[in-house]
């Protein structure tokens, strides 16, 4: 790159370093921050690198925020996405298109139903789309001037980007906003983060810059003094030289000149030279977030504005481009504003409040122009907070709401308290739970209105639920209900929240009472969405109590579009419906619905909902036997929940991931995850999460042939669930593992009553998964008591139930038990075929520990299987292949991997003495195996 700009003199090495850094392909995402003192040349290097990368066909999204824009929500993010071509936007789902349009203020926020997560996800989607064609550079000049909402979005975006070719280049002033640097480092990881610290320029570079910028050559003694006074800072050196007369240059060797030192003194001296008109223009521009010539003319007498604009442009204070009037350097704007008196600024902001169009900027000018608390100003700020929230600018909404509280007159207590509660809600939404808690705990003791107090207590209960302690959250809900009076909506919201907490704490009867009270209030409200939600909440609790599935509810409430505003994902009607399908063994329907809901959540950028849906999808996939997908979805749900910072919920996502890893036989990983979940669950006293994570540890021990250790972990869980009346057999799926552990320990007398109760409930409810597991456990009990024939019949009955429901792992467990029994009956061929089929399934889905059990049993049979005939799996594969199916088609038909089909074909050819697919087809025809295929 040819560096010829005056501003880049002496900085060629830094520019080359930057460009080399961005040519690296890993790691991604990459973030580089140019750090240095004000005026040291950060922006010049940034501009050069940005221009060069654009020339190298990078997609560049850039913004140059100023300090005056820092109060405007999404101002920087709007600059980043402004100018995107229509094709980029058309690739987004409609909700995300509306989110981008909202950032650009092209749509009414009341019509867009946006969340901050939706805004963030839309931006990520844009970046990902652009990165598919060429690398993307997110370029920000003056990181410290980012508005909070844009900063929130950018950090969130970088967290979501993994392997995409995306990089970030930003500038930041030394000794300021180090927190932002640390947050960037934590987001992209140390390996993808670098800081370029700018050093002072040399004497020669400073001299050449002054010569080329001001067309003067400083005598060497004066150049040395200017260099020392500026500290090698080019901006400061130019400003010092600008203040010296040419006569001073000529006489510099004859007398000592007063050289101004320090930025404030230098800039002050330069601004002192402006006329009154130019000073007024500069002040108006410094107070505006985005100064324009029209606004300056509106704020000042026309003649003053005209003269002043000409002068400030000639003197290099402002750069006028069309209607835009931008300061030549951000330091000039700060200096102009800082020199003005408080009264002067107050009057100016009051005047500007009547001129600007943006609602948020207007209200901030009103606030800055107020002499004392003013209800008109406070009400405007509160309304602006609502508008910002509707745009998804939740951080900006929190800031505006805080300002509204500050500007509310002290005698208007109810208004002040109302706004404090709103502020807490916005802070909680933005992820600042500590700030929300402090605000609520400070406000609640002063609340005289019972309705406000109940609302505040309900919000505090949500804070406790997500971050602290579930029993305490329940107590806060009860306190909120006690004071709710005749406010049905507060009661309804609190009852629904309390229902979920109590069911999670395994107070099922209490949960049912709360759910039924909520349903009654929902009917009284006439709100159809709330009625649907409340009916499904009650149906869920009744299901957990072992009362089965309310078929009327399930047939009437299938609509996937019934979403309730401001409700958490776990009680949204479509999600509740899908979870009930999962728990009641409607696996195919549940999976399809969960996948649709997941896509919808992503389209709207609702990652909290997406994580909850993935948690259930991962659990379901483990039950089905799609273990690799289960791990992928469990891991992703854990990642999102971690970033959301909701501590107690994290224990559930950890469980789902751990469960999948345990079934894959990854002992160390699954144990670590389950113990992590247990630690969180015990801290928050999240009883259900304790049960789930402990159950994973018990399953690991059972998989390792350590039944005594499994029993030690699982037995207390069974007692706990029985005591809580959470007796739905398909809900926790723990009891069959405990029964197997007891039988393996020789404790048949303890296993028998548990099994009888389990079988009775399974039969009563018609729960297929429980009927299959119960039949297997019955067979294990009969085998342990010395009745192998009975055991074999039970195992075959279990397989009949398995055939009604896709549960590859559980079916393979039953085949393993049947194979062991057949071996004990000395039915060698049948035992080998059954064990081989079980092994094939475990190998195909990845159940490593249980596959080892099969291999051990096959090893005990001894001999070779080559003359024992085909296993059932081999027969099905041979039949399909002889019928002309390809290996891939056969694999899809039997839900096997192509590799498994290939290995089975090798064994089939060896057993039958064949060498080709044609010979296999002929063999089937000759031996009339086609009839057997149809029968099977």
Q: Model regions: which residues?
A:
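N-terminal pre-P-loop "Q-motif" helix
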Residues: 7-21, 873
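Conserved phosphate-binding/catalytic loops and adjacent sensor/switch elements of nucleotide-binding enzymes
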Residues: 40, 45-136, 145, 175
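Tandem amphipathic alpha-helical repeat scaffolds
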Residues: 335, 383-389, 418-430, 454-470, ...
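Short secondary-structure boundary elements
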Residues: 35, 40, 201, 205-213, ...
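Sensor-1/coupling segment of RecA-like P-loop NTPase cores
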Residues: 153-187, 192-196
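Amphipathic alpha-helical segments of tetratricopeptide repeats
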Residues: 402-406, 441-445, 478-483, 516-526, ...
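Helix-turn-helix DNA-binding segment
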Residues: 793, 817, 859, 863-906, ...
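Extended alpha-helical scaffolding segments used for macromolecular assembly and cargo binding
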Residues: 31, 45-49, 135, 146, ...
């Amino acid at each position: 790159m040819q560096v010829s700009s005056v501003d880049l003199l002496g900085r060629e090495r830094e520019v080359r370093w930057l460009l080399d850094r961005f040519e690296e392909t890993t790691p991604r995402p990459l973030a580089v921050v140019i750090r240095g003192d004000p005026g040291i040349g950060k922006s010049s290097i940034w501009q050069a690198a940005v221009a060069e990368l654009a020339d190298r066909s990078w997609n560049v999204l850039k913004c140059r925020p100023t300090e005056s824009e820092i109060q405007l929500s999404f101002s920087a993010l709007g600059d980043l996405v402004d100018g995107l071509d229509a094709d980029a936007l058309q690739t987004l789902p409609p909700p995300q298109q509306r989110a981008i349009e909202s950032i650009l203020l092209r749509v009414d926020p009341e019509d867009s139903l946006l969340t901050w997560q939706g805004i963030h996800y839309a931006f990520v989607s844009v970046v990902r789309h652009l990165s598919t064609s060429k690398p993307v550079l997110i370029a920000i000049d003056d990181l410290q001037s980012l508005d909070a909402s844009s900063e929130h979005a950018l950090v969130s975006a970088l967290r979501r980007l993994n392997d995409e070719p995306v990089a970030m280049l930003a500038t930041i002033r030394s000794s300021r906003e180090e927190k932002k640097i640390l947050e960037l480092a934590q987001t992209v990881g140390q390996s993808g983060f670098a800081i370029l610290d700018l050093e002072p320029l040399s004497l020669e570079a400073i001299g050449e810059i002054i010569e080329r910028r001001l067309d003067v050559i400083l005598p060497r003694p004066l150049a040395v003094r200017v260099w020392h006074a500026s500290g090698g800072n080019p901006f400061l050196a130019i400003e010092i030289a600008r203040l010296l007369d040419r006569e001073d240059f000529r006489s510099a060797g004859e007398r000592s000149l007063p050289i101004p030192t320090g930025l404030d003194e230098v800039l002050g001296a330069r601004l002192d030279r402006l006329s009154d008109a130019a000073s007024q223009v500069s002040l108006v521009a410094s107070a505006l977030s985005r100064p324009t010539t029209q606004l300056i003319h509106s704020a000042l007498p026309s003649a003053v504005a005209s003269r002043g604009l000409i002068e400030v442009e000639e003197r290099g204070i402002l750069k006028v481009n069309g209607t835009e009037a931008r300061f030549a350097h951000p330091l000039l704007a700060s200096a102009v504003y800082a020199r003005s008196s408080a009264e002067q600024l107050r009057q100016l902001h009051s005047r500007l409040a009547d001129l600007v169009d943006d609602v948020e900027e207007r209200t901030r000018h009103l606030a800055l122009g107020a002499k004392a608390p003013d209800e008109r100003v406070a009400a405007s700020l509160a309304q602006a907070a609502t508008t910002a929230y509707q745009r998804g600018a939740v951080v900006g909404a929190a800031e505006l709401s805080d300002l509204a509280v500050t500007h509310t007159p002290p005698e208007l207590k109810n208004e002040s308290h109302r706004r404090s509660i709103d502020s807490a809600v916005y802070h909680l939404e933005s992820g600042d739970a500590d700030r929300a808690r402090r605000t609520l705990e400070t406000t609640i003791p002063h609340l005289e209105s019972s309705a406000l107090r109940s609302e505040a207590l309900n919000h505090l209960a949500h804070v406790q639920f997500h971050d602290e302690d579930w029993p305490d959250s329940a107590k806060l809900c009860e306190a909120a209900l006690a004071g709710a009076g005749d406010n049905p909506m507060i009661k309804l919201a609190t009852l629904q929240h309390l229902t979920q907490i109590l069911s999670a704490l395994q107070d099922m009867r209490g949960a049912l009472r709360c759910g039924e009270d909520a349903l009654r209030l929902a009917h009284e409200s006439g709100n159809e969405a709330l009625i649907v939600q409340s009916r499904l909440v009650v149906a869920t609790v009744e299901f957990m109590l072992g009362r089965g599935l309310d078929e009327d509810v399930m047939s009437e409430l299938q609509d996937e579009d019934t979403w309730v505003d401001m409700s958490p994902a776990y009680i949204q009607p479509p999600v509740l419906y899908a979870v009930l399908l999962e728990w009641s063994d409607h696996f195919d329907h549940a999976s399809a619905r969960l996948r649709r809901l997941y896509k919808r959540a992503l389209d709207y950028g609702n990652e909290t909902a997406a994580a909850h849906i993935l948690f259930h999808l991962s659990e379901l996939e483990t039950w089905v036997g799609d273990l690799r997908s289960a791990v992928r979805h469990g891991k992703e749900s854990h990642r999102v929940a971690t970033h959301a910072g909701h501590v107690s919920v994290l224990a559930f996502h950890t469980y789902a991931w751990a469960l999948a890893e345990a079934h894959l036989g990854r002992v160390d990983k699954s144990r670590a995850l389950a113990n992590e979940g247990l630690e969180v669950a015990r801290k928050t006293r999240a009883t259900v999460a304790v049960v789930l994570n402990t159950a994973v540890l018990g399953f690991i021990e059972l998989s390792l042939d350590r039944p005594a250790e499994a029993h030690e972990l699982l037995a207390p869980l069974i007692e706990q669930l029985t005591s809580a009346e959470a007796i739905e057999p398909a809900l926790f799926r723990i009891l069959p593992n405990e029964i197997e552990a007891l039988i393996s320990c020789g404790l048949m007398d303890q296993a028998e009553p548990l099994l009888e109760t389990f079988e009775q409930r399974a039969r009563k409810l018609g729960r297929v998964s429980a009927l299959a597991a119960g039949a297997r456990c019955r067979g294990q009990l009969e085998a342990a008591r010395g009745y192998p024939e009975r055991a074999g019949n039970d195992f075959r009955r279990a397989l009949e139930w398995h055939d009604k429901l896709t549960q590859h792992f559980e079916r393979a467990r039953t085949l393993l038990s049947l194979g062991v029994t057949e071996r004990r009956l000395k039915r060698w061929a049948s035992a080998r075929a059954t064990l081989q089929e079980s092994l094939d399934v475990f190998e195909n889905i990845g159940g490593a520990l249980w596959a080892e059990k099969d291999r051990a049993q096959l090893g005990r049979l001894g001999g070779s299987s080559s003359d024992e005939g085909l296993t059932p799996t081999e027969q099905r594969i041979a039949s399909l292949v002889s019928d002309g199916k390809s290996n891939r088609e056969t694999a899809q038909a039997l839900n096997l991997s192509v590799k498994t089909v290939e290995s089975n074909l090798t064994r089939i050819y060896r057993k039958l003495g064949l060498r080709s697919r044609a010979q296999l087809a002929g063999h089937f025809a000759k031996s009339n195996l086609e009839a057997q295929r149809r029968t099977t």
